[in-house]
A protein has these predicted regions:
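Core transmembrane alpha-helical segments of multi-pass membrane transporters/permeases
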Residues: 1-24
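Hydrophobic alpha-helical transmembrane segments
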Residues: 4, 42-44, 121
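Transmembrane helix-loop junctions in multipass membrane proteins, especially transporters and channels
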Residues: 19-23, 58-61, 108, 112-115, ...
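Hydrophobic transmembrane alpha-helices that form the pore/transport pathway of multi-pass ion
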Residues: 27-95, 105
Length: 168
């Protein structure tokens, strides 16, 4: 049934994402977009996890793909190791409700309820965006409370260069 077909594919796809470096690419894009902002690395974790969630649908694959880059960045900026881990775990968990792929449960819902998967994905879009907005705001307020700055512009990748060189 659904479990043996789709769960196997999630595991296989997660391994593929790791080998191809897509997790690093998402972190680099997120860094270019938000690394400069107050508390930059934590906001990078939120964006990169949302991006990875669009293709993996697995919180574990998401942590592996982006957490190995974002957690050390957050600790280097001054976040506690506990907060850095919590941000990555929270942001990565959102990948399970981030369309279009989402978690295996979305496929099960579509099958059990008898609606097309695309309807389940459309219904999840607004809650997923609200979830990530909540994580972003939590990160923002903690960064302001702690006086944490972003990453200097000269240390950030240029998003246009990233898209031209690695966005294929």
């Amino acid at each position: 049934g659904v479990s043996s077909t789709f769960i196997y594919l999630f595991i296989l796809f997660g391994a593929y994402l790791e080998v191809t470096g897509l997790g690093k690419f998402f972190v680099d894009i997120a860094n270019a977009v938000a690394g400069w902002a107050s508390g930059g690395p934590a906001k990078v974790a939120v964006i990169s996890s949302a991006l990875e969630g669009t293709v993996s649908g697995s919180s574990v694959a998401n942590v592996v793909g982006s957490g190995s880059f974002t957690i050390p960045m957050m600790k280097k900026l001054g976040y506690s190791k506990e907060f850095a881990g919590a941000v990555e775990a929270s942001a990565s968990t959102g990948g399970q409700i981030m369309p279009p792929v989402m978690g295996a449960a979305a496929f099960l819902m579509a099958e059990f309820v008898g609606v097309p998967y695309v309807d389940v994905a459309k219904a999840a879009a607004i809650p997923a965006l609200l979830y990530y907005m909540g994580v972003w705001l939590g990160v923002h307020f903690e960064a302001k409370r702690c006086g944490l700055k972003g990453i200097p512009f000269n240390e950030l990748p240029k998003w246009k260069t990233l898209l031209m060189e690695k966005g294929h």
